[in-house]
């Protein structure tokens, strides 16, 4: 049996752009992607802390160090510039792999620079 587990998480990213006329996706600073082991074209779930919206799309890498978090296409309808979002990727793991898997989690500051890297998500963690 395989279980779907969180593999990477970008916590408290601030939306820098929303481009309705682009052909879908989310553009993410590639330095952030590297820190959480996310790849171009990988499916991600985005949760908007401001309005509760949950959407899925795929990743386009942005300029490293730019701090870009841009929702494109229809996804742009679910955010405003300045909204705080959580971006998560998932992987399929066997039961044995799932028991030892540790997702990569980063917490960003208000300019989308990595503020801290968490080794794993603890229950009831408040940032």
Swiss-Prot record:
Phylogenetic classification of the source organism: Bacteria, Bacillati, Bacillota, Bacilli, Bacillales
InterPro entries xref list: Asp_de-COase-like_dom_sf, Asp_decarbox
Keywords: Autocatalytic cleavage, Cytoplasm, Decarboxylase, Lyase, Pantothenate biosynthesis, Pyruvate, Schiff base, Zymogen
SUPFAM superfamilies: ADC-like (SSF50692)
Pathway linked to the protein: Cofactor biosynthesis; (R)-pantothenate biosynthesis; beta-alanine from L-aspartate: step 1/1
Location of the active site: 25, 58
Record function comment: Catalyzes the pyruvoyl-dependent decarboxylation of aspartate to produce beta-alanine.
Example of a GO biological process term: alanine biosynthetic process
Known partners and oligomeric status: Heterooctamer of four alpha and four beta subunits.
The protein's required cofactors: pyruvate
Binding locations of substrate: 57, 73-75
Name of the gene this protein is made from: panD
Localization in the cell: Cytoplasm
GO cellular component: cytosol
Protein name: Aspartate 1-decarboxylase
Family label: Belongs to the PanD family.
Residues found modified as Pyruvic acid (Ser): 25
The record's free-text note on cofactor binding: Binds 1 pyruvoyl group covalently per subunit.
GO molecular function: aspartate 1-decarboxylase activity
Listed CDD domains: Asp_decarbox (cd06919)
Broad class of the protein's primary localization: cytoplasm
Signal peptide extent: none
Keyword Cytoplasm found: yes
Enzyme Commission (EC) number: 4.1.1.11
Modification after translation (UniProt): Is synthesized initially as an inactive proenzyme, which is activated by self-cleavage at a specific serine bond to produce a beta-subunit with a hydroxyl group at its C-terminus and an alpha-subunit with a pyruvoyl group at its N-terminus.
Catalytic activity: L-aspartate + H(+) = beta-alanine + CO2
